[in-house]
Curated annotation (Swiss-Prot):
The keyword DNA-binding applies. It comes from the Bacteria. This is Probable transposase for insertion sequence element. GO terms for biological process: DNA transposition. It comes from Corynebacterium diphtheriae. Belongs to the transposase mutator family. The keyword DNA-binding applies. Keywords: DNA recombination, DNA-binding, Transposable element, Transposition.
Length: 343
């Protein structure tokens, strides 16, 4: 760096007192959020910028977002979400000298405007009553006072935790997961007719019609061939039946989870590239960056279609629920007193 008597020289490329380029840090974080591993980024910097940077340095740079992750994870939430979805993603994390499978649970809340927000991420070795009690308490402590429906995949201990935290909320088994579980043991060539037959169950206008459709499937050739598919629905029947009380538009919000499924698909793709994570914090950091990256792309696409500027509010915001206006009106009819409290 040149020296001058008055000390007025200010470098443009590397400001005084800094050791790294902030633009380079941003690029490394962007590559990491895009799904590249630390070794991939090291190779990329070496080949494109002829820069030799150690994996530890790259990891330290990406750790700079941990404070943002904690702020996001502890942020205040809306007091009411008409619908909350809970879904899980399996990740491999090192535990000493072995690699274990852990579940990363994601809560997605649909607000009064139909916008889907990721409320939080939690990594756990196994689910249970105490775990779900802590998750519900976390959401409640951050401001969530009520939800009409909590939609999940028959998670153990969750109904009890929801009833203790939000006594008026209804726990609903996720229809998408039920369909997937019913098709798990079905051969590929039979999946289409089995799915078509089971569609008569979850699109039935009443509980009696749905039960008759399931009985008819059980008595059919396909039902006798795949009794496990019938058992899946029988076992989940008590948690499935409340779904039938809603009109079609509200039902579509509950079983149309395309945006959540597509988000999970992209997260699975990125986690497969990494193989395994050194610890829970690294997994949480990586998933948060991936979600930000994915939702930023979606927001840019929506803004381009609407020909308007992107509004950055510091939150991870997803797509709008399909047919929401009709659905929220139907939910308002189903829960008139509670709905009026949050207008």
């Amino acid at each position: 760096m040149p020296r001058d008597r008055a000390g007025t020289f200010t470098p443009r490329m590397l400001p005084k007192g800094t050791r790294r380029l902030t633009e380079l840090d941003d690029m490394i974080i962007s590559l990491y959020a895009g799904g590249m591993t630390v070794r991939d980024i090291q190779h990329h910097l070496a080949t494109t910028l002829s820069m030799d940077m150690s994996p530890d340095t790259i990891s330290t740079i990406t750790d700079a977002v941990l404070e943002e992750v904690m702020i996001w994870q502890n942020r205040q939430l809306d007091e009411f979400y008409p619908v909350i979805f809970l879904d899980a993603l399996r990740v491999k994390i090192r535990d000493g000298h072995r690699v274990v499978n852990k579940s990363c649970y994601m809560a997605v809340g649909v607000d009064m405007d139909g916008i889907k927000h990721i409320l939080g991420l939690w990594i756990a070795d196994n689910e249970g009553a105490s775990f779900w009690a802590s998750v519900c308490a976390d959401l409640a402590n951050r401001g969530v006072q009520d939800a009409f429906i909590v939609c999940c995949d028959g998670l153990k201990g969750l109904p009890e935790a929801v009833e203790a935290t939000w006594p008026n909320s209804m726990v609903q088994t996720c229809i998408v997961h039920l369909i997937r579980a019913a098709n798990r043991w079905v051969s590929y060539q039979d999946r289409k007719p089995v799915s078509s037959a089971l569609r008569e169950v979850y699109t039935a206008p009443t509980e009696d019609t749905a039960r008759a459709a399931l009985d008819a499937f059980e008595a059919s050739e396909l039902g006798r061939k795949y009794p496990q598919s019938v058992k899946v629905w029988r076992d989940a029947w008590d948690r499935f039946v409340p779904f039938l009380q809603f009109p079609p538009a509200a039902r579509r919000v509950l079983y149309t989870t395309n945006s959540i499924e597509s988000l999970n698909a992209e997260l699975r793709k990125a986690t497969r590239n990494r193989g395994q994570f050194p610890n829970d914090t690294a997994a949480l950091k990586t998933l948060w960056l991936m979600i930000c990256n994915i939702e930023d792309k979606r927001a840019a696409q929506r803004a381009k279609k609407a020909k308007r500027a992107i509004e950055c509010n510091g939150y991870i915001e997803g797509a709008k629920a399909t047919g929401w206006k009709q659905a929220i009106n139907q939910l308002a009819v189903a829960y008139p007193d509670r709905f009026a409290d949050y207008l």
